[in-house]
């Protein structure tokens, strides 16, 4: 049966093959571009602004950029603030 399918199957045209390959390449590039070049500087700038108001450890700030679909990016910022000191 597989032999019969082999001889009766139609070959894909080169345009559809090229399109599939291009889609694979584009998807792979999107995955490899995990962190934009400006993200470290953005983290430093955000940390600098936070330090104007609260004394925190730089390790307590995390910045992540997540891709959702083709045209949506989500910037997630997590800051662990120190506990408030008691005033007398």
From Swiss-Prot:
InterPro entries recorded: MinE, MinE_sf
Signal peptide: none
Keywords: Cell cycle, Cell division
Superkingdom of origin organism: Bacteria
Keyword Transcription attributed: no
Matching Gene3D superfamilies: Cell division topological specificity factor MinE (3.30.1070.10)
GO biological process, one term: cell division
Family the UniProt entry places it in: Belongs to the MinE family.
Role: Prevents the cell division inhibition by proteins MinC and MinD at internal division sites while permitting inhibition at polar sites. This ensures cell division at the proper site by restricting the formation of a division septum at the midpoint of the long axis of the cell.
Protein name: Cell division topological specificity factor
Provenance organism: Cronobacter sakazakii (strain ATCC BAA-894) (Enterobacter sakazakii)
């Amino acid at each position: 049966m597989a032999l019969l399918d082999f001889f009766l199957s139609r070959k894909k045209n080169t345009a559809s093959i090229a399109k599939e390959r291009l889609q694979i390449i584009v998807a792979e590039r999107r995955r490899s571009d995990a962190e934009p070049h400006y993200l470290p500087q953005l983290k430093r700038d955000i940390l600098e602004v936070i330090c104007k108001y609260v004394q925190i450890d730089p390790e307590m700030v995390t910045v992540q950029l997540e891709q959702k679909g083709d045209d949506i990016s989500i910037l997630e910022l997590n800051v662990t603030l120190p506990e408030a000191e008691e005033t007398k």
